[in-house]
């Protein structure tokens, strides 16, 4: 795909697609709950479709009329052994969270995925589930897909300290704990996104959260609910950055989810001096309207507890930093190496090919700001990573002459099927 965008500034209002994390979980909770769950504004990206198809294969009736999705849950014990292996596509969330559910079911299921997902570590989720009584066998000693899970109807509660800051691993243990005998205790070293905990309560479940300690009693029964999915702040992040770095821009993003475990990017924008307004806050829905306009930015440091609250936004934050005055340092983000790609290396390579000055490190990047971007000599390949594709497309807005050849642009379908339509709407051309 060729990108040649001569933007005179981005203008307009936009409603970004539904939050990917909440979309996954709404299908999962609806499938293990008893009764009907109705979901509004779900993200119909490839990852969420993988979750839907997996639960259909487990015997759950899921209807989509194009407006709302209806999940006819019969309770977790009614899930059935799949007739064939479950295709997880490129979705780490689908794989890891579903593993927690399968761990407590008395049958065997095999999960497989695409080349990218098959390289990602699954031992981090296999270890606690094995401690609880599930049998899990992966492709290697490190446990990678394809992975076979033989669940147990007699899971035992455990006390578990998460070795990595991962909402996916935490959520897998919570889903397994719902089926276990006794009280499961999960301790986080760094707080990660809290959608699973909050949605468990919404579906009538019991959970106690005290700072970084989570207690989940076993043997729980959940009830179907009506869910409205807010806009995804990870998708909104691309427009927030575009509005800040493209001259003469002013954007309003409506109904964006602002769960406090996901708003690290807003704090970074404010720390860098970006003109950002948070309007029309809905405390119950945890959503707001966000308004940005082109700004003079300065470098900052991003590290520590902030990292889990913006881990998925770091690629586009790196682009933001290239346009800020001074140096931006990102550290404590080694988790980027095991995302859809090694995002430390891939982000640095892509932006450096356009004239940026980024030094990759073991756990982040050092970015010298104030750089003018140009079209690269060679094509940039997303390597199947949706966030890399969107980062490059936003970077193209800053290139005055020439065009960018973006290979495997279809990866963007993972989380934002209407991305290029929205880009055309806001920029006036593509």
Curated annotation (Swiss-Prot):
Pathway(s) where this gene product acts: Metabolic intermediate biosynthesis; chorismate biosynthesis; chorismate from D-erythrose 4-phosphate and phosphoenolpyruvate: step 6/7
Keyword field: Amino-acid biosynthesis, Aromatic amino acid biosynthesis, Cytoplasm, Transferase
Reported function: Catalyzes the transfer of the enolpyruvyl moiety of phosphoenolpyruvate (PEP) to the 5-hydroxyl of shikimate-3-phosphate (S3P) to produce enolpyruvyl shikimate-3-phosphate and inorganic phosphate.
Gene: aroA
UniProt similarity note: Belongs to the EPSP synthase family.
PROSITE patterns: EPSP_SYNTHASE_1, EPSP_SYNTHASE_2
Record organism: Lactococcus lactis subsp. cremoris (strain MG1363)
Binding, phosphoenolpyruvate: 20, 92, 120, 168, 343, 387
The protein, known as: 3-phosphoshikimate 1-carboxyvinyltransferase
Binding site for 3-phosphoshikimate: 20-21, 25, 166, 168, 312, 339
Subunit structure: Monomer.
Enzyme class: transferase
Active site as annotated: 312
BP terms from Gene Ontology: amino acid biosynthetic process; aromatic amino acid family biosynthetic process; chorismate biosynthetic process
GO MF terms, alphabetically ordered: 3-phosphoshikimate 1-carboxyvinyltransferase activity
InterPro entries with a match to the protein in the record: Enolpyruvate_Tfrase_dom, Enolpyruvate_Tfrase_sf, EPSP_synthase, EPSP_synthase_CS, RNA3'P_cycl/enolpyr_Trfase_a/b
Catalysed conversion reaction: 3-phosphoshikimate + phosphoenolpyruvate = 5-O-(1-carboxyvinyl)-3-phosphoshikimate + phosphate
Enzyme Commission number(s) of this protein: 2.5.1.19
Main location: cytoplasm
Highest taxon in the source lineage: Bacteria
């Amino acid at each position: 795909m060729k990108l040649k965008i001569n933007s005179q500034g981005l203008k307009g209002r936009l409603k970004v697609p539904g939050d990917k994390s909440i979309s996954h979980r709404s299908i999962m909770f609806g499938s293990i709950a008893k009764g009907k769950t109705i979901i509004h504004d779900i993200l119909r990206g490839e990852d969420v479709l993988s979750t839907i198809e997996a639960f259909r294969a487990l015997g759950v009736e899921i209807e989509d009329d194009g407006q709302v999705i209806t999940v006819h849950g019969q309770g977790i014990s009614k899930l059935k052994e799949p007739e064939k292996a479950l295709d997880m596509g490129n979705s780490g969330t689908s794989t890891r969270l579903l593993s927690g559910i399968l761990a407590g079911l008395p049958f065997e299921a095999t999960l497989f995925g695409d080349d990218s997902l098959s390289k990602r570590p699954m031992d981090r989720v296999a270890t606690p589930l094995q401690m609880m009584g599930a049998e899990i066998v992966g492709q290697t000693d490190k446990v990678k897909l394809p992975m076979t899970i033989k669940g147990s109807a007699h899971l035992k509660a455990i006390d578990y300290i998460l070795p990595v800051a991962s909402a996916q691993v935490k959520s897998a243990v919570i889903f397994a704990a719902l089926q276990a005998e006794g009280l499961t205790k999960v301790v986080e070293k760094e707080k990660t996104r809290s959608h699973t905990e909050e949605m468990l309560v919404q579906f009538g479940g019991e959970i106690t959260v005290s700072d970084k300690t989570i207690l989940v009693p076993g043997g729980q029964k959940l009830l179907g609910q009506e869910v409205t999915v807010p806009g995804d702040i990870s998708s909104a992040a691309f427009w927030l950055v575009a509005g800040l770095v493209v001259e003469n821009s002013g954007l309003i993003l409506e109904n964006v989810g602002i769960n406090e475990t996901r708003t690290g990017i807003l704090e970074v924008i404010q720390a860098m001096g970006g003109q950002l307004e948070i309007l029309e806050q809905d405390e119950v829905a945890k959503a707001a309207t966000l308004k940005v306009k082109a700004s003079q930015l300065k470098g900052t440091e991003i590290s520590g507890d902030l990292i889990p609250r913006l881990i998925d936004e770091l690629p586009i934050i790196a682009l933001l930093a290239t346009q800020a005055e001074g140096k931006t340092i990102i550290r404590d983000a080694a988790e980027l190496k095991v995302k859809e790609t090694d995002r430390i290396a891939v982000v640095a390579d892509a932006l450096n090919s356009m004239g940026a000055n980024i030094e990759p490190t073991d756990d982040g990047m050092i970015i010298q700001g104030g750089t003018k971007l140009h079209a690269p000599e060679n094509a940039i390949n997303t390597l199947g990573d949706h966030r890399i594709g969107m980062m490059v497309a936003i970077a193209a807005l800053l290139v005055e002459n020439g065009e960018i050849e973006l290979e495997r642009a279809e990866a963007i379908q993972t989380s934002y099927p209407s991305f290029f339509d929205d880009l055309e709407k806001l920029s006036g051309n593509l």
